[in-house]
Amino acid sequence: MIKIILISLALIFVIIGALISALAAIGLLRLEDVYSRAHAAGKASTLGAMSLLFGTFLYFIATQGFVNMQLIVAIIFVLITGPLSSHMIMKAAYNIKTPYTKKTKVDEISEDLKDTKL
């Protein structure tokens, strides 16, 4: 009974992760500037990849009966590097003065960086 529940939960997490990753891909195609695209990639794809890995983790627990430490390390790695990489992409784009979309009205970064040099 527990095995069926764990496999069902694993399937749900894999489907949710695939849907979130697909939404991130759509966001990369539809959004207008590099900042919005990096935001979509950093947030949604990180959550999608973590859901996929957690579903795989649950599947291994249900079918093989042990905890796969490689998946735990991969989940932690994605959790740390996904948002960090999108932040660095946006920071590099800001430093080379990549233009915003016309809908962007506020530049909060310039207000924060008046006294500091990047």
Swiss-Prot record:
Subcellular location: Cell membrane
Gene Ontology molecular-function annotations: sodium:proton antiporter activity
Main location: membrane
Protein origin, superkingdom: Bacteria
Position of the signal peptide: none
Regulation: Na(+) extrusion is completely inhibited by the H(+) conductor carbonyl cyanide m-chlorophenylhydrazone (CCCP).
Protein name: Na(+)/H(+) antiporter subunit G1
Organism: Staphylococcus aureus
Gene label: mnhG1
